[in-house]
Amino acid sequence: YKVSFKKIIHILKKLNKIKVHVVGDVIVDTHSKTSFIGGQTKTPTFSVLYGGKDDYVGGAGIVAKHLSAAGAKVTFTTVLGDDLLSKYVVKSFKNTKINLTAIVDKARPTTNKNVIVTDDYRLLKIDKLDNTIISKEICNKISKSIKKTKVDSVIFSDFRHGIFNKLTIKELSGSINNKVFKVADSQVATRWGNISEFKYFDLITPNEKEARFTLADQDSSIGNLAKKIQEITKSKLLILKLGERGALCVEQSKKNMAFNIGSFVENVVDPVGAGDALLAYSTLIYLKTKSLVYSGIIGSLAASIACEVDGNLPIKKSQILAKIDQIEKLLNLK
């Protein structure tokens, strides 16, 4: 398959008219900065001095922001608590072109994951959340939002904080127009997500751990793992994320194409959120090109940039273009 830097650059400049609806759990990622003071002599307790914090919109929220940064016209539907963090989330979308539908659930807090950091070491994470299933009323509101929004693609970004479960996935999936490109990603880093619950989607992007968790399979080769995941989900396209080993891309078609893409990461600073960048850009590129090759490559480039910065920030097209320029120079092609 012939791939050129010129074609990648051309594709990146043509993403402005794509309409995408992101549905999923928003997370406020907090980095609390501290300095180490010392430890107690009587108990195994260490002491740190608080030095401030940075908040980032993560989860499905950053997926929406990646898409917008790429030039797509984005609608984002999520559930928030009735608290200060929900106001922060809403405010963070005010200066963007994203159409936010924030459904307030007074029975739950806005999901917050607070990492305590000392000298770039992550000492502890404190979560504030409620993973109980959303009410039928809220599910109906999300369903109506999906039905009324005319888009090219719907992305379900599942972090298992209430929106998606066995009951709601069926209803919400059924609300998507059959002509719309359906994408799903389900996180199980510390939760109980299950990508196999998203049936007949066009593209799914689990990582290796999520795939093995879904299948209860720690022994199969990567190739067999990918095959089993596609068989159980009936998905057309699969990008299986392999961390520092890159990604395996599989297309179930007449060609039954499968190929590996190596990692483009040079210096890992913060890998959290890399999969969200891949999810966003891979979706847009496939919609534009119908090529899983370019979708996988550009998605992996976006993920590598996300790994090389601290905090969960939207990846811009200009950053990917700069990365491509850097790679061209390393290969002595420029």
PLM regions with names:
Residues 17-20, 28-155, 173, 178, ...:
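Conserved N-terminal subdomain of the carbohydrate kinase-like
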